[in-house]
Amino acid sequence: MDLRLGDSREVLKDIKNESIDMVITSPPYDDLRNYNNTLKWNFGVFKDIADQLFRVVKQGGVIVWIVGDKTYKGSETGTSFKQALYFKEIGFNLHDTMIWHKPNSFNFGSNNCYKQSFEYMFIFSKGRPKTMNLIKDIPSKMAGKTLKGARKHA
């Protein structure tokens, strides 16, 4: 395993073409965080990184892209979907989409909108994925059942 830490715009330049099997990342989006005033994350920066990812990911490789959207003036930005569509535009397949529920978040927000307590996990593949291990649900004895009475769980 080769783990790299740094600014993706710089780190990706040093990686050989079609040499990466898998990328897992949750990049900044919609300027929700301040990174020491060093990076203004915008669609141009995203496109540069996505283009480099297409160059370095092998045929059959995958990217797990975890991203959300900011709500601004009562409307979600749609950044996550714009990014997903751009990945498709440059040649990746949108293999799967999952929802990641963020722990310790509340579902209520302000301004007549629910707070985003989740992010999208887009799974992109370059061609057909070489390996895929589907997540299997853990069976629950209580699934589909209702409890009656005043019994409380402690």
Feature roles, as predicted:
Residues M1-A154:
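Core catalytic lobe of class I
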